Regions:
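Residue-level signature of mid-helix packing/kink "hotspots" within the transmembrane helices
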Residues: 24, 52-60, 145
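Short hydrophobic/aromatic, small-residue-rich stretches within specific transmembrane helices
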Residues: 13, 17, 45-52
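Helix-loop-helix hairpin linking two adjacent transmembrane segments in secondary transporters
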Residues: 127, 131-188
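Conserved MFS/SLC helix-loop-helix module at the cytosolic interface between two early adjacent transmembrane helices
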Residues: 57-96
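Extracytoplasmic
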Residues: 8-41, 117
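MFS-fold secondary transporters
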Residues: 85-89, 105, 184
Length: 205
C-alpha cells in the first residue's frame, strides 16, 4: 500500500476518532439538562454513569462481534449507533429520551473503542502505527475540547442554533458522524484474517 493511499484511508478513520470524542459531551450536557429539567444531583449524575455502564456491558461482546463481521463493519456499526444517539435529542430533551440517547452514545462508544484501534492497524503498521494512534487520540481530544464551547455558543445564540439552544451541539456532531459513515463506507480496507475460530462469550470470561 502506497503512502498516499494510506494517508487517504486515514481520513475516515481519524473522523471516527473524532466521533469517539463525542462521548465527552455527556458531562456538559448533564449540567444543561440539570438546569433545564430541574433535576437533582443524583438524577443528573446518571447520565455520565450510563457511558461507563454500557462500556462494561458491551466491551467483551464487541470483541466477539468484531471477530465475526470484521473491524470496518464494527466501526461502521458504532458510527451508526452514535448517529442515532445524536439525532434523538434534536426532537426532544425529556429525561427518559435523554437516558435513551446517552445509552446509545455509550454503546456506540464501546463498539468504537474496541474496534477502531485494530482497524487502524490494518492501514498503518510499525513505527507509523504508534504515531497514528497518538494523532488519533489528539483528534479525539479536539472533539472533547469543542463540545462545551459549541453548547455555550448555542445557549447564548452566538451561533445559529435552530432554536435548539445548547442542543445545537447534537446536530453539529451528527453531521460529522454522517460524513465519517459515508467516507469509511466508501473506503476499501484490507483486513488481516484472525487465525482460529472466534472466541465464545464463556471463553472470554
Amino acid at each position: 500500500m502506497s503512502e498516499k493511499t494510506s494517508s487517504l484511508k486515514l481520513i475516515p478513520v481519524m473522523l471516527a476518532f473524532f466521533a469517539m470524542g463525542f462521548v465527552d459531551l455527556v458531562g456538559i450536557a448533564s449540567n444543561y439538562l440539570k438546569a433545564d429539567l430541574g433535576l437533582s444531583d443524583s438524577e443528573a449524575n446518571i447520565f455520565p454513569s450510563l457511558v461507563f455502564f454500557w462500556f462494561l456491558i458491551f466491551s467483551v461482546p464487541t470483541g466477539m462481534l468484531m471477530n465475526r463481521i470484521g473491524r470496518k463493519k464494527t466501526v461502521l456499526l458504532s458510527l451508526i449507533v452514535t448517529f442515532l444517539s445524536l439525532m434523538i435529542p434534536i426532537f426532544d430533551d425529556a429525561y427518559m429520551v435523554m437516558l435513551i440517547s446517552f445509552s446509545l452514545l455509550g454503546i456506540g462508544n464501546a463498539l468504537m473503542q474496541t474496534s477502531l484501534n485494530p482497524l487502524l492497524s490494518n492501514i498503518v503498521s510499525g513505527d507509523k502505527l504508534a504515531s497514528s494512534l497518538t494523532f488519533g487520540q489528539f483528534v479525539k481530544a479536539i472533539a472533547s475540547f469543542l463540545a462545551p464551547y459549541i453548547a455555550m455558543w448555542g445557549a447564548t445564540q452566538a451561533i445559529p442554533s435552530m432554536e435548539l439552544g445548547w442542543r445545537v451541539l447534537f446536530p453539529v456532531y451528527m453531521v460529522i458522524a454522517v460524513i465519517a459513515i459515508l467516507l469509511l463506507g466508501a473506503t476499501t480496507i484490507h483486513e488481516t484474517k484472525e487465525e482460529g475460530r472466534p472466541s465464545t462469550f464463556g471463553e472470554c470470561l
